[in-house]
Amino acid sequence: MPEIKDSSTNLSNVPQAHEVPPDQAFYLIGIGGAGMSVLALLLHDLGYHVSGSDQVQADTLGQLRAAGITVFVGHREEQVPTNAIVVVTSAVHEDNPEAARAKALGLEIWHRSQALDFCTRSHDLVAVAGAHGKTSTSSMIAHALLKIGADPSFAIGGVIAELGTGARLGSGSAFVIEADESDGSFLNYSPAVEVITNIEPDHLDHWGSAEAFEQAFVDFTARLREGGALVLCADDAGVKRLAQRVPERRGVGGPRVISYGFGVPLAGDVVVQLSEPELGPGRGHCQVSVADAGQQVFHGQLELRIGGQHMLLNAGGALGAAYALGVDLAQFIAALGTFSGASRRMQLVGERDHVRIYDDYGHHPTEIAATLKAARDLAGSGRLLVCFQPHLYSRTYHNVAAFARVFAAVDDLTVCSVYAAREAPIPGVNGNIITERLGQGTYVADMYAAGLHAFRAARPGDLLLFLGAGSITHVGHAIAAGHDFASVEQADQAKASQA
């Protein structure tokens, strides 16, 4: 990735808005992405000259052009203005011609997170962080705020099912983001509200150790604006350790701590207490009580149209954020009842030969365990079959025992080769180490062949879950659409049809 002038732990080099000239140009590489397109509109609304490029003719480019933003298809060095601040994502590498040109010209290069923080300093920025649960929790917050008329802006990693998008520019004061810890970019934000769903060591290829990973979350809490709110999950061991490490609040301007969960609350100012959970296929409800300084301020029932106790817990985090924003909790909790989920979170993609086919983004053992519980409820009297694509060699290596434990709960397991993403292979590490550790299941290296193997093992009434953060999603959709992958060419065509 191109060198970024500011480090991820120090924003001193990113100017305040009044210090950036009103005629400043910004150039966004990858402008068509959901999050980048919203950022482009934000910069444009602030009066800056905005242009950018994307490798493909994305649907968002038409909206950007209609707003008066210059957009190019394809990355070429001559398109980069010589006076621009260039904005990149972690997906932009040094061999990108526009990034290389910006570096050669000595232009400022900002990460998307830095630019988004710059644009949202006048908003109530709500940042949701955690090893898992970020997308669902941030989606719940954005969805409910929209339903009650707060007109929020948001930039989320997944697509909110009812809205068909994961990014939106609204006129309200709230801006909801999913803060990514995988590359440290969440340390670039200055939130008014931080929601931390859990702290379970992950992305050790970047952080190096569990201790460094946990320290990053301590550093994240230090990014909170004066007078802001920390919304912390009391049911997570890592968050409990964090709460002990965050300095005591003293004096005016210190952060408010809002604890949420089913168990014993953390010491803090506000407690969102969940109790009496009842779960069923595709639904769940529980009691909610909110106390501020020991005085009850709200009591009601939370009902969700999605299953799993982990989703009720995520909704508790959303309620904590809503309370921090001063939102009417009765309206907000009613709006949560209309939330139908985020894409790739136990998403029903179709039914074929009386086999229900679901898709889920789960890639860490803890979140997979929660997903499998919800999937088991949905399976009813049918069997639960899983086709899993491990994500990252390092995660697979470090968590092989945990993967084996959680997958012992399924009736039939197929594992394909690792989705490498940003990593180089680790000798001796692939999907087969999971089935070998488990002592059952089938390893099929090619993901299309693995998907077809899993489908052929299913019987009418079964539930087949495609699981993983990589490209396995294409397989589930394609099989649901009737593809059988008789050849590599057909597999490629099936994938193209889902793009």
For each of these PLM feature ranges, what is it?
Residues S53-D54, F72-H75, W110-Q114, A155-G158, ...:
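Beta-strand->loop->alpha-helix junctions that form or flank phosphate-binding loops
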Residues M1-A115, A237, G307, Q493, ...:
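N-terminal leader/targeting and accessory segments in enzymes
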Residues A17, L42-D45, R65, Q79-P81, ...:
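Phosphate-binding loop of NTP-binding sites
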Residues Y48-Q55, A229-A234, L385-Q389, A409-A420:
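Short internal beta-strands
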Residues T70-T82, T165, D446-A454:
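Short acidic low-complexity segments
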Residues E19-Y27, G35, L39-L46, L187, ...:
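Nucleotide phosphate-binding/pyrophosphate-handling subdomain across enzymes
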Residues F403-P460:
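C-terminal helical cap/extension that packs against the catalytic core
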Residues G228, G382, D462:
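Glycine-centered, small-residue-biased loops immediately flanking beta-strands
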